[in-house]
Amino acid sequence: MPGLTIGDTIPDLEVDTTQGKIKLHHFCSDSWTILFSHPGDFTPVCTTELGKMAQYASEFNKRGVMLLGMSCDDLESHKEWIKDIEAHTPGAKVNYPIISDPKREIIKQLNMVDPDEKDSNGNLPSRALHIVGPDKKIKLSFLYPAQTGRNMDEVLRVVESLQKASKYKIATPANWKPGEPVVISPDVTNDQAKEMFPQGFKTADLPSKKEYLRFTNV
């Protein structure tokens, strides 16, 4: 589906939320932001997802990440539904704002439309999630179908990966978890790597004898 994608700057839209009107760029400020949509209020998967997002809010906050939800339901619906979300996930408080987009214009501008899920008013939002960097650019996007809930451990994992890669010349390998070794970017020479990573690094001994797979801890 064409539209906003990785590397694009999010539009500076003014939106109505459960915490009042906000401008997206002002809300994001210089922080990392998770902007996520859900198909509808008072639905089973969405209730579990937003509850888990609230449950993980302290972990995102530790990493300087703002949370912003969205669907096409009205604000009163959002506010009533929050009671169910918090009841289903004891101890979790939905303290992040949720955008109301009844005209379904914002989901189109943010590329969060599900082409297969519709109601009488048109296409519903997908289970989309954009991770936006401090520069207001999209760094990563998830697009899940209505039938599959998102995994907050994975969201937290990729946030850590993106933040480390923005600070160091590294990437995270397959199945990487926070605390595990990362790989040094291939455009970094060994001499440069010695300066950048004084803690040292280990080069994999490969049949090709090429020294491109170098592990370090950051």
Swiss-Prot record:
Pfam families tied to this protein: 1-cysPrx_C, AhpC-TSA
- Originating organism: Medicago truncatula
Q: Which Gene3D superfamilies match?
A: Antioxidant, Horf6, Chain A, domain2, Glutaredoxin
Q: GO cellular component terms?
A: cytoplasm; nucleus
Name by which UniProt lists this protein: 1-Cys peroxiredoxin
For this UniProt record, the keywords arranged alphabetically read as follows: Antioxidant, Cytoplasm, Nucleus, Oxidoreductase, Peroxidase, Redox-active center
Q: Where in the cell is it found?
A: Nucleus; Cytoplasm
Molecular functions per Gene Ontology: thioredoxin-dependent peroxiredoxin activity
Q: What does the record give as the reaction this protein catalyses?
A: a hydroperoxide + [thioredoxin]-dithiol = an alcohol + [thioredoxin]-disulfide + H2O
Under Enzyme Commission nomenclature, its number is 1.11.1.24
Q: Which PROSITE patterns match?
A: THIOREDOXIN_2
Q: Which residues form the active site?
A: C46
UniProt keyword Nucleus, yes or no: yes
Q: What else is known?
A: The active site is a conserved redox-active cysteine residue, the peroxidatic cysteine (C(P)), which makes the nucleophilic attack on the peroxide substrate. The peroxide oxidizes the C(P)-SH to cysteine sulfenic acid (C(P)-SOH), which then reacts with another cysteine residue, the resolving cysteine (C(R)), to form a disulfide bridge. The disulfide is subsequently reduced by an appropriate electron donor to complete the catalytic cycle. In this 1-Cys peroxiredoxin, no C(R) is present and C(P) instead forms a disulfide with a cysteine from another protein or with a small thiol molecule.
Q: Which residues form the Thioredoxin domain?
A: 4-164
Regarding protein family, the annotation reads: Belongs to the peroxiredoxin family. Prx6 subfamily.
